Amino acid sequence: MNVAHSLSEKPVILCLHFSGGTWQAWHGIFPHFSADYSVIAPDMRGHGKSEKPESGYHIEEMADDIILLLNELGIECCHIIGSSMGAEVGLSIAASHPEMVQSLVCEGGLYDRWGEYSLLEGTKEEAEIERTELLASIYNEKELVYSSAEEYLSSMKGEFKEAKIWNRHTETFIRSTMEQKVNGHFANRFTKNVLAGFISSCWDIRLEDYYCKISCPVLFLPSQEESENRLAEKSIQHFSSLIREHYITYIPDSLHAYVWLQFPFQAADAVISFYKSFKSGRLSS
């Protein structure tokens, strides 16, 4: 497993990136934690420079990878910050190994993929149609290949500028997603097989089954869109009722998964305020 870390005697923060991400998704927030914390940021299974097996993309399998990594590094306990998929993996770790997790930040893991606590309104049969169509669209999507690194970066820059999240942190992240093929062309390291494997493995997961097993404080960090969605609000309220200590906040104009690149100072500040709140006993519950 490819991993970046700066270990010392300081408390440890483990950063778990979103689907399609790399450890460089956290590039913007590292400086905000370096004074008081050690930071570990791996490329999770199927991502970045880590191995890309054909299977094993259930959140519990990816959680097992991370637990092995922590054991190898001699980390007995840590704070976890998870983004989208990474939040679900972090949640799985907190549920199966509560003694290892001091706190959990969930910028993701806020709702199921279908069912009562999801953003899909409809029957199980309609949800299955949604899943089938989603997987078909992934498998049918043509891989984008570029003749040069500059062409790859230019294309990605256009997409990120359109989303209004282009900055030096996103540029560093985008460079980390690029790899050169045997034929000399450039493409994204993240493959559709990995994405489809993750969606297939995790479609029926009920996140409430994990939340009810954790014992650490949780910060829910929905995006602006999620904070304004009544179904997301319903789900977050239900999940928060299953845990002993929680806090809910959001950053204005934030985008799901990309807030750490988009507003690194505000995102890091939200996490640090959360840490101070539960240490002083002022955490909402």
Task: Explain the meaning of each model-derived region.
Residues K10, I40-M85, S96, F265, ...:
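Active-site loop/oxyanion-hole signature of alpha/beta-hydrolase fold enzymes
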Residues M44, G109, S223:
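Active-site loop/turn elements of alpha/beta-hydrolase fold enzymes
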Residues V145-E226:
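Alpha/beta-hydrolase
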Residues H5-S55, Y275:
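Conserved HGGG/HGGXW glycine-rich cap/lid loop of the alpha/beta-hydrolase fold
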Residues L104-S147:
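Flexible "cap/lid" loop of the alpha/beta hydrolase fold
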Residues S254-P264:
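Catalytic histidine-centered segment of alpha/beta-hydrolase-like enzymes
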Residues K213-S254:
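Conserved loop-alpha-helix segment in the C-terminal half of the alpha/beta-hydrolase fold
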Residues E76-L120:
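Conserved hydrolase catalytic core segment
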